[in-house]
Amino acid sequence: MGTLDGKVALVSGSGRGIGRAVVEKLAAEGARVVLNDLDKDVADEAAAQLRQAGAEVVACVGSVTDPEFPGRFVQAALDSFGRLDIIVNNAGYTWDNVIQKTSDEQWYAMLDVHLTAPFRILRASSDYIRSAAKAEAAAGTPVMRKVVNVSSVSGVLGNAGQIGYAAGKAGINGMTKTLAKEWGRYQVTVNSVGFGLIKTRLTEMVADAPGTIDIEGRQIRVGVNPELLAAIEPSIPLGRAGTPRDGAGAIYLLCIPESDYITGQVLLCTGGAPI
């Protein structure tokens, strides 16, 4: 038996990278999962591969910044699996600049994906969360539920050149603490995981060619210069950047029954940097 048998999870931004690793881990522990990606081909392929491995997974394609998406996402869990127990707000990307070079478009793009989208997903889930909790309490069978919001060490300490990203991630930490107070009565824990340097396609790039991703028609430069990576990694006490599996492990810890009395916290997953 898995630690999450019978649970149903939503994981946004989960076709690749940390999100994909989260889906794999939750499914391996018995959860049924609705995964999400902006790219239909990526989402469908990920879902097919996971189902082939024995997971119960469905895909919900769409942009988390679309105001209509959160309702579809929550409904996908209820229609496919009949319940909702875990919400992981993972979708995001970096679009970095110093303040004097940051346009309004760039600023709002970072707030939309890192703060507004999680807010809307959680708001869309609130009717189900509250009604289910009340019914379970009345029946004498309370059920713990979990929300994990993906943040960053940049949202805790700030980071030069990431004015919009850091603001969005700081905001999600504030929302986490507030919702922990609002939803505690419904037996829901709400926590954030603040990542440090995790190697994904968003942080890696070819030495001679900056990487880009297409976000709703915008070509966004991503990646960390390999020379900078080489300088950063020795400063991490564990001596290396994290992996998607490392990130998934931190999120998983906040989804299991052993963390039922932990709420309103920001867990840093940074390999010890900074201490």
Question: Where on the chain are the PLM-derived regions?
Answer:
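Substrate-binding pocket helix/loop in short-chain dehydrogenase/reductase
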Residues: 98-99, 103-111, 232
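Active-site helix of classical SDR
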Residues: 122, 168, 176
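Alpha-helical segment proximal to the catalytic Tyr-Lys
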Residues: 127, 181-182, 260
